[in-house]
């Protein structure tokens, strides 16, 4: 399991990568989709031949409640309509784990079901929390799924200054879905997935 000989430094490197994304200047992003409650932007990824997506919206709940629903655990399967299974393969200290999860087909199954094996880390960030992840090269594969790969991704959640009962949730996602999929289909799916994620989460809270 490459890269996990030193979990603490692996987690710190991942966290620092996400903080770097969080400081990218606004003029580097292009709007991919906008709804009443959520905006999704994108820019070319430096990790692979695809896009880094940024999503942002206000959620009417406390930071810890929101992140508890997002990070790996029993809450996530209850509300995330894209996720079809989630197993914790290994637990480490300091809010780190390895999880395997599967996603449903999308766009009338142009994008077939996917499987991911990710390292996940949740850590304090300013007055809030950051829950971040990255895929691992895991040998065991299931033939009924295409193995996707998440380059560094994560969710920053901080309380609003003027109303601490509301939180600003900002996500950074760069998923290589792999397989033979037109880029236009990937772009449509990613933008819709992110806006749906906020809708599902709001209903669950």
Swiss-Prot record:
It catalyses: cholesterol(in) = cholesterol(out). GO terms for cellular component: cytoplasm; cytoplasmic vesicle; cytosol; endoplasmic reticulum. GO terms for biological process: cholesterol import; cholesterol transport involved in cholesterol storage; intracellular cholesterol transport; positive regulation of bile acid biosynthetic process; positive regulation of cholesterol metabolic process. Residues 1-205 form the START domain. Keywords: Lipid transport, Lipid-binding, Transport. The keyword Thylakoid does not apply. InterPro entries: StarD4 (IPR042555), START-like_dom_sf (IPR023393), START_lipid-bd_dom (IPR002913). Gene3D superfamilies: 3.30.530.20. One of its GO terms (molecular function) is cholesterol transfer activity. It comes from the Eukaryota. Involved in the intracellular transport of cholesterol. Binds cholesterol or other sterols. PANTHER family: STAR-RELATED LIPID TRANSFER PROTEIN 4 (PTHR47006:SF1). This is StAR-related lipid transfer protein 4. It comes from Homo sapiens.
């Amino acid at each position: 399991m490459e890269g996990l000989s030193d979990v603490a430094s692996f987690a710190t490197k991942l966290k620092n990568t996400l903080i770097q994304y969080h400081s990218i200047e606004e003029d580097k992003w292009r709007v991919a989709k906008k709804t009443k409650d959520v905006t999704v932007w994108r820019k070319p990824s430096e990790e692979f031949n695809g896009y880094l997506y940024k999503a942002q919206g206000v959620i009417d709940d406390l930071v810890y409640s929101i992140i508890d629903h997002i990070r790996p655990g029993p809450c996530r399967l209850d509300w995330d309509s894209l996720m079809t299974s989630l197993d914790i393969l290994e637990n480490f200290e300091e809010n780190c784990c390895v999880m395997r999860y599967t996603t449903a087909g999308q766009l009338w199954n142009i994008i077939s079901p996917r499987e991911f094996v990710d390292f996940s880390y949740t850590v304090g960030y300013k007055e809030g929390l950051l829950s971040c992840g990255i895929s691992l090269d895991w040998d065991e594969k299931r033939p009924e799924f295409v193995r996707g790969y998440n380059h560094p991704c994560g969710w920053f959640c901080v309380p609003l200054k003027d109303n601490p009962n509301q939180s600003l949730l900002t996500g950074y996602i760069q998923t290589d879905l792999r397989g033979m999929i037109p880029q236009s289909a990937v772009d449509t799916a990613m933008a819709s997935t992110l806006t749906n994620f906020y809708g599902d989460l709001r209903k669950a809270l």
